[in-house]
């Protein structure tokens, strides 16, 4: 039976009636219904949870004549189960008991106190500390898209208005939201259908006027012109839907969301989804984080610094002034690299602690960590005090010291607080006199009980008399069964044991009531004092958030300074003249993975040398050479130093890569279709200021189709678009392009054959490669010798069929399509005169030719 079958509430027990009413308010998400020490789920929720969480599915009696499916999780372990559900893209409504069971005539009063969704979590246990966790909303019209993202764990609110599908796909790839809200009539479902955490929303939630009202109310403004988003109608619709969703799920004010920013394409270097994937910036092609650019560059010591660095990597800047400030700071911080990281490490994740403070969900240990962070600020300020770097002084000023707040927390919170306020013992002794008095009363019970036991034992002469406490029956006086007949009449029996009797007397009962009252009073007062701490901290929230942002940036810059020093990076020069010139360029990731020294290579692109046709053997390093150019360019535009002896980089507006491909089975697209789609995107959107990497265009179809496509694409990039292009190919016909198109040059990666083996030199040389070494690479890979031998025979046949090992060039002249390897046996036969041989000599020649073959 499903929940929907139970429409007649009167046929259910009172408790199930309460559950069904609450569930009706949250029909699409799981409801965790608190019952004692467990959160229970019923009906379809129970079945779903048992599968997702791999917990037992049981039954709880029956209601309306049917057995009720039930599953449950213990309340003390709920965070682990919530983390698993959130990771799977599920949302959960948490229903707590808010009434007093002792005063309730029917079921204890319950209500949903919070809703946990993948995009709105702020609990430390549910978050990946080194990765942003974003909630996003999307809107679409005939004129483009609106897109809004919010990191509720920091308050960072961003808008964008992608104009086309490719740009929207790139934004989704860049931001990778944990939860995505979309309107019920959303047309471009293929863009989002494979994403996690999808939430379908009603159209009215995207109403523009309502969005403006919501945002003005949140920011306490009359209009949104101060944020520069007044005309961003599509993005505002998405932002309004997103903000209302957060308010509905969090059920509290959101003071840490203080502003919103629109991100415009012209502010940064644009990279489409394929480029971000191919460059393996934060995620490798297998979906992991090993051997990515972030894995090499991210040695930050705070989680908030790690998250900021990843945002920088995914949004390289075009603002030369900001980049220069970062470069100067990195240069200065190389001298402070020993002293700052240990201090910054102690700061921890202040950004997310402040978000929990704003949501009033911060736990005692959050406040202890905040206190510890404040304690590092004076020393951090001292370390930067003597620097003449203007940007570092700005960060120093923004960090502040918060002496008053530090002293408040030092006075208010114990050194090592418990996990939860309800456990008690959070507020430090001496902070509040009334609390100290109640605690003294509760804590004095042991002394009182010892005195009472001695007094009663001596007065009655009962050597077996003991005074104790039991969690069920409370305080008691215990006497052995053999002496129980000697107790006075005012001893009232409370419990009978096998060998003893337990009693209560009026004096002990009075003291018990007093102690229990004092414990309750102390805990109640402690909770109130804890809430008052929030009230005293929250007025400083804006300054605290600015401080956290400054500390995160200082961590990133210090980290990049350490990376530059440790990995021998140099400071790049950003020029206003078009082109890229690298001396001794290295791939930042590959050089860390290799056991052998990395072979550094130059790169020279300019308006007079716009395209390099890159040839050479498979495994020779063509893809590495191309990718390192893109990664060095990207690193330079986040302000980082780069792996090169020298780097001079001109204006760049976009980076495109067409490097490798796999079948997109989910969309029904073959490898070749994926390749052509990515190529079309480049040809439509690249400009003369773009950096384009094209690797093996046309290999997914027949030889002549592929060659024709590769030729035409190269011509378009060099003649029409004039983009800075690295064009790797196995089509040797393309090496004639420099003879026909101005601004095109050949380079190749060298290799040397030694008999049946091949040595890759990984060194970039001017000019075209002499051959592809395909069969040599196959032999190196372990292809059986008989297969290699057969391949050589077949190669000769194909070369013969194509016209004496030559194929027609695209311009009508001749060029070998497959380079022929001359056989020693053929050379010997060509030099032989059969008419001059004796029978014995002919036999000897047969054996010699056999050995040559």
Curated annotation (Swiss-Prot):
Biological process according to GO: mismatch repair
Cited function: This protein is involved in the repair of mismatches in DNA. It is possible that it carries out the mismatch recognition step. This protein has a weak ATPase activity.
Name the UniProt record assigns to this protein: DNA mismatch repair protein MutS
Origin species: Erwinia tasmaniensis (strain DSM 17950 / CFBP 7177 / CIP 109463 / NCPPB 4357 / Et1/99)
SMART domains, A to Z: MUTSac (SM00534), MUTSd (SM00533)
Superkingdom of the source species: Bacteria
UniProt entry keywords in alphabetical sequence: ATP-binding, DNA damage, DNA repair, DNA-binding, Nucleotide-binding
NCBIfam families: mutS1, PRK05399.1
Protein family per UniProt: Belongs to the DNA mismatch repair MutS family.
GO MF terms held by the record: ATP binding; ATP-dependent DNA damage sensor activity; damaged DNA binding; mismatched DNA binding
Binding site for ATP: 616-623
Tagged with keyword DNA damage: yes
A cellular-component GO term for this protein: cytosol
